Each structure stands twice: as structure tokens, then as C-alpha cells.
Amino acid sequence: MPTIKQLIRNTRQPIKNVTKSPALRGCPQRKGTCTRVYTITPKKPNSALRKVARVRLTSGFEITAYIPGIGHNLQEHSVVLVRGGRVKDLPGVRYHIVRGTLDAVGVKDRQQGRSKYGVKKPK
């Protein structure tokens, strides 16, 4: 417990909240342009070729975003919407691309969990 004199000398510092998605600048989503679309391998013990895109956001940040779902139509200069949310087995990937908006089309032939992949209700 500090003395009153110590508290006068230097006041208590408030605890700063550290955001997990700083590139969004407090917004729920951000628009951006793909600069590179490629695959990377996850860390142990998983094995796959995960699809990711390097995206330049309107906030000025250059980030790596995961492309969820099976198959995609993204290429360089595609305009995408990015949300927060990391991919646990891909180090440095802290954002997801929102499917079914802007240039990212929804996942083809998706029946369950459609809202997460931008798919309309089948007739």
C-alpha cells in the first residue's frame, strides 16, 4: 500500500485495454483491397494449405486476413470486407474476410451455417 506522499509524487496509472484487432480502429468491419492472395501452412500438429489474402485497409494498415469456406474467387485488386477474429493455427492472421459481400462471393452449395458464409436460402 503506497503512502499519500508516494501517490502525490506519481499517481496511479489506469489499466489500458489492448485491442486484439488494432487495424480495424474500433470499427466492426473495414473495407480493403487485396494485394496478394496465397496459401500458408498451419503450425503443428495441423497440416493443410490455408487460403489467406494480404489486404490494404482503408485505415491504412496492411494485414493478413483468412478466407473462410471451401473455394473462393478472390484475386489481386479484389475489394473485400474484413472483420476481426483470429485463426488459431495461423500465426499473425488476426482477421477474417466476410464472405457474400463486395467482391467475395458466398460459398457454393453450402447448406448449413449459411449466414457465416454469405449463402442465400436454397429454394
From Swiss-Prot:
One family name in Pfam for this protein: Ribosom_S12_S23
Annotated disulfide bonds: none
GO molecular function, one term: rRNA binding
Organism: Nandina domestica (Heavenly bamboo)
Subunit structure: Part of the 30S ribosomal subunit.
Gene name per UniProt: rps12-A
GO CC annotation: chloroplast; small ribosomal subunit
Lineage, uppermost ranks: Eukaryota, Viridiplantae, Streptophyta, Embryophyta, Tracheophyta
Compartments, record wording: Plastid, Chloroplast
NCBIfam families per UniProt: rpsL_bact
Coiled-coil segments: none
Matches recorded under PANTHER family: 30S RIBOSOMAL PROTEIN S12 FAMILY MEMBER
Membership in a protein family: Belongs to the universal ribosomal protein uS12 family.
Alphabetized SUPFAM superfamilies for the sequence: Nucleic acid-binding proteins
Predominant location: plastid
Protein name stated in the entry: Small ribosomal subunit protein uS12cz/uS12cy
InterPro entries: NA-bd_OB-fold, Ribosomal_uS12, Ribosomal_uS12_bac
Function recorded in the entry: With S4 and S5 plays an important role in translational accuracy. Located at the interface of the 30S and 50S subunits.
Keyword annotations: Chloroplast, Plastid, Ribonucleoprotein, Ribosomal protein, RNA-binding, rRNA-binding
GO terms for biological process, alphabetical: translation
CDD domains cross-referenced by the UniProt entry: Ribosomal_S12
